[in-house]
Each structure stands twice: as structure tokens, then as C-alpha cells.
Amino acid sequence: MTNQLTINNNDKGYEHIFVHGEKGWWVNAGKSGLMVKPMRAMLDQIEAMLSNHSRVMLIRFDLRMESYTPDNKIITVFNRRLFKWVKAQYGVSRIGFVWCRELERAKRQHYHYALMLDASKVNYPNSITKKVLQIW
């Protein structure tokens, strides 16, 4: 068995190391596998932030919904409000983010979200996490 990601017809990987560019990342692919396209997009976003900043603050949180929605417009509105506040509060010009809507049927609809900011301007996540709760 190699340590490279194996991709099947469903564009899922089942190995424990995800190879992206020249780097390998340890991942928990689990029994259901890893969605390759979103993983690549996330790593591209992290690398873009690191190419502009020597340190990046990554804040990861879940956004839970009370009821099902047929689209993701709520994330667009959330981003607009959060980014406006973050730019005003911290004076950052570049904000990285990734999100993924959970597809499980047994649980309530929710989003996994990661916000990436210049760590030379944002030292602690407390104010941001409070604002996330307020906006959501």
C-alpha cells in the first residue's frame, strides 16, 4: 500500500495521507472516505493565505441550522456580515475561508467552517467567536 491518495470513480480517497502538490497531509479518511475536491480547495486556500502572511490564525467552528434549507444563501449573508466586521475590527485586507455543508441525514443540517486571518493582526479568536455567535 502506498501513502498516496487513491481516487476512485466517486472522487473519494481512502488513504491516511492526502498528497497535494509536493506536500503530504495526514487525514482521517474514515470508512466513508474523503471528498477530494473540497480537500484540495481547502489546502489551496491555506496555501494562498500562507503565501501572503508568515503566520495564519485558523478558527474552525460549526454553524448549526434549526431547519433544512434548499440552498446555501445563508452562508453568503453570514460571510458578508462577518467579513465587514473583521475588516473594520482588525484592519485586515485578506480573509481566507472554507466551508462544507454536512450531508448526513440523521442530524440537523449544519456547516463546518474555517476562517483564516493574518495572525500578526489577530492574536486571539475570542472576539471573533463571540461575533460569529452574534451574527449566526
Task: Give the residues covered by each predicted segment.
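Catalytic core of pol beta-like nucleotidyltransferases
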Residues: 83-88, 106-109, 126, 130-133
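Eukaryotic short linear interaction motifs
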Residues: 68-70, 106, 121-123
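Signature for HUH/AEP ssDNA processing cores
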Residues: 44-103
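Histidine-centered divalent-metal-coordination microenvironment in nucleic-acid enzymes
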Residues: 97-120
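Charge-rich, low-complexity segments
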Residues: 1-53
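Acidic, low-complexity intrinsically disordered regions
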Residues: 21-22, 95, 132
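Alpha-helix boundary/N-cap detector
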Residues: 30-37, 73, 77, 127
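Helical (often loop-to-helix) elements that flank the catalytic cores of nucleotide-handling enzymes
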Residues: 116-136
